[in-house]
């Protein structure tokens, strides 16, 4: 079924409205949906300034293919099955084929939470997606999608997890929750947009070909219409660039260097002490100015072979070279 449409919307380029602002239009040139549920839409945007066609087209294409949220089956549990390389009695397809068929289901959900669907089918006959038991806010878009073929008396019973996400998610074997309850995980394709093409044409304004016209083609899996996909992509881009309108141009203030901390890391060799005083401090495991500042003058006198003359030498060196002083005695109540 093909529906030809021509819907035009006017937009204004520019941060403020004025008579010099450039108006452009978005037109849905064509829209149709095939028997497989693939929805196609063709849009024309223009006139744009020269060079903006590629900029807008490339940005929209990337967002459409990778940033739109979709719904997919993430794991399946089949009664009597412990691994994907087994078979189900009376079912033509092996477990791997059933998992691949479940992977190709097209679903639409309004809930951000992981949900559980079920299937109980008895042969003989073909099992299609319309026989799935789904939560109330989950809809199957391709109800005629084939899942399995059952022989006389065969029973296929399964549960499957339904989740939302972006892009493509490979099997995560570290997901202990799913592994612990015997679910077989499958690679999930959340992308509602299957394909995007764009082309930039010259647009005539007056007598001159001085503008761009962007032609955008979008194919979706049917869970979104191309119009909805384009609208969502535009909102994502607006949200991405909006914070740039409030950029602060104030230069960041560099942090002040911690001069005291730098001094504290200086080795005691910089004090240029006498050999006697230096050796006594080293034997007491005093290696830096930071270590030395933990002592009082009285504490220094308690170091073996460290006399009053050596203590005065240390105090004078600290004062002369770094402007630091040692207290004479330790305050009461402090260790």
From Swiss-Prot:
Its Gene Ontology biological processes?
Answer: DNA-templated transcription
What are the start and end residues of every segment in region (Alpha N-terminal domain (alpha-NTD))?
1-248
Spell out the protein name for this chain: DNA-directed RNA polymerase subunit alpha
- Cellular component terms per the entry's GO annotation: cytoplasm; DNA-directed RNA polymerase complex
Give the start-end ranges of region Alpha C-terminal domain (alpha-CTD).
256-335
Keyword field? DNA-directed RNA polymerase, Nucleotidyltransferase, Transcription, Transferase
The protein's job, in short, is:
DNA-dependent RNA polymerase catalyzes the transcription of DNA into RNA using the four ribonucleoside triphosphates as substrates.
Answer whether the UniProt record assigns the keyword ATP-binding to this protein: no
Q: How does it assemble?
A: In cyanobacteria the RNAP catalytic core is composed of 2 alpha, 1 beta, 1 beta', 1 gamma and 1 omega subunit. When a sigma factor is associated with the core the holoenzyme is formed, which can initiate transcription.
Q: What is its EC number?
A: 2.7.7.6
State a single Gene Ontology molecular function: DNA-directed RNA polymerase activity
Q: Which gene encodes it?
A: rpoA
Query: What is catalyzed by this enzyme?
Result: RNA(n) + a ribonucleoside 5'-triphosphate = RNA(n+1) + diphosphate
| Class of enzymatic activity (EC top level) | transferase
The beginning of the lineage is:
Bacteria, Bacillati, Cyanobacteriota, Cyanophyceae, Synechococcales
Q: Which residue windows are coiled coil? A: none
The domain-related comment in the record is: The N-terminal domain is essential for RNAP assembly and basal transcription, whereas the C-terminal domain is involved in interaction with transcriptional regulators and with upstream promoter elements.
- The organism's superkingdom is given as Bacteria
Spell out the Pfam families in the cross-references.
RNA_pol_A_bac, RNA_pol_A_CTD, RNA_pol_L
Which family does the UniProt entry place this protein in? Answer: Belongs to the RNA polymerase alpha chain family.
